[in-house]
């Protein structure tokens, strides 16, 4: 049975990782936007030195902050969940890392940002445009930049096969810096085949994927992740989708969801899924969520 009167996102960052506001501010903003369910998803601690990930020595503080907000907002009608955006980097990080168990998480997002192996200089596909260009040209000196998407889709498929998470994050993040096809052709048959292989595997494993509004809020692409052609494939294969703000500031919360939901409808979707309790997902119509956000 479909429910109504819901608004949600399970992809929220704060000052504990690379967000620009504290958890209290992000929760308050979500509540003001009539959210009923909110998930915090700090970039998980990993062994690489980064400015983006939750440091291990702040993990306890992160857990305490989110659990405290959950207690504060539940009586007001908004459920808050504790999560991590985990990383898949072969040989370095994986979503089901047992080191995360003591945090007693409600859920995990599985994401790929890095396209490098342990013996290569680490860089991510969502770096700044200039930084990405420098790293890619050094990484692929022969100019065969198909290596970018080949590695990305390989890692996505490997992550899906390995499991250990609940939501697949920003499915085609690899496109972020590929503005006007600068690095590779997203309409090339080999590219779409690799993307569809990952989609089909996700369907086989029955994973939930997010339509991520970060591609609208923080990218020159001006469109969500994933692209419409991937969303259509997901819909055809019966993949359930949720929606994630990938919010790094309060201004990212809720604002871009209507546009993303319109795109989901173009792909054939009529409903979204939201987490009502750890491991418990429920279905709601897109129109109902739009109405809640108004």
Q: Where are the regions that the model predicts?
A:
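An N-terminally biased module of ancient metal coordination in phosphate/nucleic-acid-related enzymes
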Residues: 1-95, 100-102, 175-189, 229, ...
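Conserved, mostly hydrophobic/aromatic
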Residues: 11, 30, 108, 170, ...
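Hydrophobic residues within beta-strands of alpha/beta enzymes
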Residues: 38-40, 108, 168, 209, ...
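Flexible loop residues that form catalytic
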Residues: 43, 113, 173-176, 214, ...
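Extended substrate/RNA-proximal surfaces in nucleic-acid metabolism proteins
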Residues: 59-204, 289-294
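Active-site-adjacent C-terminal substructures of enzyme catalytic domains
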Residues: 190-253
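Mid-to-C-terminal alpha-helical segments outside catalytic/metal-binding sites
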Residues: 255-294
């Amino acid at each position: 049975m479909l429910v109504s009167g819901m608004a949600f996102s399970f992809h929220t960052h704060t000052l504990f990782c690379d967000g620009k506001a504290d958890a209290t501010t992000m929760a308050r903003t979500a509540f003001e936007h009539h959210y009923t369910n909110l998930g915090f998803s700090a970039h998980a601690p990993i062994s690489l030195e980064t400015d983006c990930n939750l440091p291990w020595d702040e993990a306890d503080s992160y857990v305490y902050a989110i659990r405290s907000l959950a207690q504060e907002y539940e009586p007001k009608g908004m459920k808050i969940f504790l999560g991590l955006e985990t990383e898949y980097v072969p040989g370095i990080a994986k979503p089901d890392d047992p080191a995360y168990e003591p945090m007693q998480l409600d859920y995990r997002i599985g994401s790929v940002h890095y396209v490098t192996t342990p013996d290569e200089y680490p860089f991510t596909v969502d770096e700044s445009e200039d930084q990405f260009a420098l790293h890619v040209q050094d990484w692929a000196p022969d100019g065969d930049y198909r290596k970018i998407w080949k590695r990305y889709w390989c890692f996505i498929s490997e992550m899906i096969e390995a499991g250990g998470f609940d939501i697949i994050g920003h499915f085609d993040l690899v496109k972020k810096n590929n503005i006007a096809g600068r690095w590779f052709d997203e309409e090339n048959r080999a590219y779409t085949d690799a993307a569809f292989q990952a989609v089909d595997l996700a369907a086989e494993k029955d994973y939930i994927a997010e339509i991520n509004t970060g591609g609208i809020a923080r990218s020159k692409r001006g469109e969500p992740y994933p692209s419409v052609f991937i969303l259509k494939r997901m819909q055809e294969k019966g993949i359930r989708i949720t929606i994630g703000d990938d919010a790094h500031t309060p201004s990212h919360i809720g604002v871009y969801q209507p546009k993303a939901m319109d795109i989901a409808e173009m792909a054939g979707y009529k409903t979204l899924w939201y987490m009502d309790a750890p491991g418990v997902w429920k279905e709601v119509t897109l129109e109902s969520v739009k109405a809640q956000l108004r």
